[in-house]
């Protein structure tokens, strides 16, 4: 579920001269997930896979994706000494609708580094993502498997 924390990292690093679109974000998410060891068919990538299946998906500049991935990685390391993989692999539940994305994470797994960076703040409406985004910590969220 932590993959969507990258939206706040991108929001902080984004420059008006380099606008994002859903296809770019989908490729960037797939790239970050792949580097973190997340399989392409993982449910966390549902949004990215749906975007890339849409008719009219534009060709992507892979160099631009790699450059942005590097910029995010450096910012995370410099700001909080945390890897993108540690962020992306955070467990939780994701609810995705046509207009909203809600990410619920276990309260007992809240990470002070992520909190300090503001990655878990609700960004609200992100026009370049096309949805309202909210993050929640909850004691009722249960996850299994390895935790970073």
Where do the PLM segments sit?
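Short, compositionally biased pre-sequence/patch detector
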Residues: 1-148
């Amino acid at each position: 579920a932590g993959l969507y924390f990258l939206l706040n990292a991108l929001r902080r690093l984004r420059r008006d001269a380099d606008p994002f679109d859903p296809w770019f974000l989908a490729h960037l998410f797939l790239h970050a997930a792949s580097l973190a060891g997340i399989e392409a068919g993982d449910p966390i990538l549902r949004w990215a896979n749906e975007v890339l299946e849409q008719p009219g998906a534009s060709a992507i500049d892979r160099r631009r994706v790699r450059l942005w991935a590097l910029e995010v990685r450096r910012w995370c390391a410099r700001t909080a000494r945390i890897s993108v993989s540690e962020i992306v692999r955070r467990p939780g539940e994701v609810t995705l609708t046509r207009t909203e994305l809600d990410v619920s994470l276990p309260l007992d797994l809240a990470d002070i580094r992520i909190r300090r960076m503001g990655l878990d703040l609700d960004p609200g409406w992100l026009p370049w993502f096309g949805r309202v985004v909210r993050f929640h910590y909850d004691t009722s969220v249960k996850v299994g498997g390895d935790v970073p």
